Swiss-Prot record:
Its biological purpose: Required for maturation of 30S ribosomal subunits.
CDD domains: YlxS_C
Name of the protein in its database record: Ribosome maturation factor RimP
Gene Ontology cellular component annotations, sorted alphabetically: cytosol
Gene Ontology biological-process annotations: ribosomal small subunit assembly; translation
Compartments, as annotated in UniProt: Cytoplasm
InterPro entries: Ribosome_maturation_RimP (IPR003728), RimP_C (IPR028998), RimP_C_sf (IPR036847), RimP_N (IPR028989), RimP_N_sf (IPR035956)
Organism: Idiomarina loihiensis (strain ATCC BAA-735 / DSM 15497 / L2-TR)
């Protein structure tokens, strides 16, 4: 059986796409009594508070019926924002030559958390420039990654 995040993504995606938004990603954070389901949506024209409210209403109704989560949780719907988290390698493709913050499952070259310039994305393989060195990382080895906005 798929893990909870994959199951939630499969349940939520059709509702988000029916409202003509892209499902950027889903996070379920367990924190004792205060678990949170975070749904990130995107659209080429941006995301408004009303868009988030519409998606929240649809997703909430759907999850009430499907009931995939067996603990109390808060539902949050938002855009990925300027520090957008990356849930898969394909999402990184438009951000080549940008700075991305990474947290790896296990250290590579004595680094587990670092910022790097994204040089290339080929399938699940990422090529990164870190401290005047090049690092190859497979997306399955990435625990978390998010864009680091440049303020020029």
């Amino acid at each position: 059986m798929a893990n909870l995040q994959e199951r939630l993504t499969d349940i939520i995606r059709p509702a988000v796409e029916a409202l003509e938004f892209e499902l950027w990603g889903v996070e379920f954070i367990r924190a004792g009594k205060f678990s949170t389901l975070r749904v990130y949506i995107d659209h080429p024209e941006g995301i408004s508070v009303d868009n988030c409210a519409d998606v929240s209403y649809q997703v909430s109704s759907l999850l009430d019926v499907e009931d995939p989560i067996n603990v109390e949780y808060n539902l949050e719907v938002s855009s990925p924002g300027m520090e957008r988290p990356f849930f898969n390698a394909q999402q990184m493709q438009p951000y080549i030559n940008e700075t991305v913050a990474f947290e790896l499952v296990a250290a590579q070259k004595n680094k587990r958390k670092f910022k790097a310039e994204l040089i290339a994305v080929e399938g699940e393989e990422l090529t990164l420039a870190v401290d005047n060195d090049t690092l190859q990382v497979n997306m399955r080895d990435v625990k978390n990654a998010h864009l680091v906005p440049a303020f020029d």
